Amino acid sequence: MTRCAGLVVLLVSLVSTCTATSAIAQNVNLASDKDGRIRTQLNPRNAVTLSSEIAARIASLPLREGDAFRAGQQIVGFDCALYQSQLRKAEAATEAANAVLQSDQRMAELNSIGKFEVEQAQARLKEAQAEAASARLLVGRCGIAAPFAGRVAKRHVAAHQYVTPGNPLLDIVETGQLELQMIVPSKWLAWLRPGAGFSVDVEELGKSYPAKVQRVGAQIDPVSQTVAVFGVVDGNQPGLLPGMSGWAVFPTRK
């Protein structure tokens, strides 16, 4: 009875393995068609969720979803009246501490006070300078500049809304040269190299664009025997958008 049960378990295991292998092979085949074309997708080179670094009310949020922006352009502004007031107070305290130190140093030269008093004045000045630096840092975070040229993918907040540190504000994507990502059979590495040319048929536009392989993935999937390949479309193609998909056609595979 035990031997029969063992055989049943073995058969079930073999069937499960074959089923899993068949599913993997089917998934790999879905990525290509009978003509050897490979499924590919356009991805932004950079996609970032901008978050708040301070607690403040949003004073300026000029961009809406789909709007374009330049690198370095301020795309979020905060009401920082409180932080600016704290900075002015810290700078005034620094000036006062510096004046006390200079006075104590002159008095020490006349032997009116000792070295300890001068050292205390120096410590108070350093503390005031640190407070001013901290306040200056907060004021510097009262606006968010775009790290690259791109477009707004999603707005998480609205103007005049109060946010705290860590709150997501905007999802932005770079709209320069988009990156093509695809999964190809690992045996293609026998001839596929960075710089190899191919064309990509974009389904959403019904157009074909020249492209080239930029880099090959660092490892092969041992189960599916596939590897990731990344490419770029030649030239500036403003009609292309992140998320578009299509087919990569390699001349040697026609």
Label for each model-derived stretch:
Residues Q41, A59-P62, A68-Q74, A145-W188, ...:
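Surface-exposed patches in structured soluble domains
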Residues T175, P194-P210, P238:
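Low-complexity, intrinsically disordered
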Residues Q74, C80-A81, V118, P168, ...:
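Short, surface-exposed secondary-structure boundary micro-motifs
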Residues A153-R155, S208-K254:
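Structural microfeature recognizing short secondary-structure transition sites
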Residues G6-T19:
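Bacterial N-terminal signal peptides
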Residues D35-R37, N43-R45, E53, R64, ...:
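Extracytoplasmic
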Residues T21-A55, Q214-R215:
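N-terminal beta-strand block that forms a small beta-sandwich/beta-barrel module immediately after a flexible targeting
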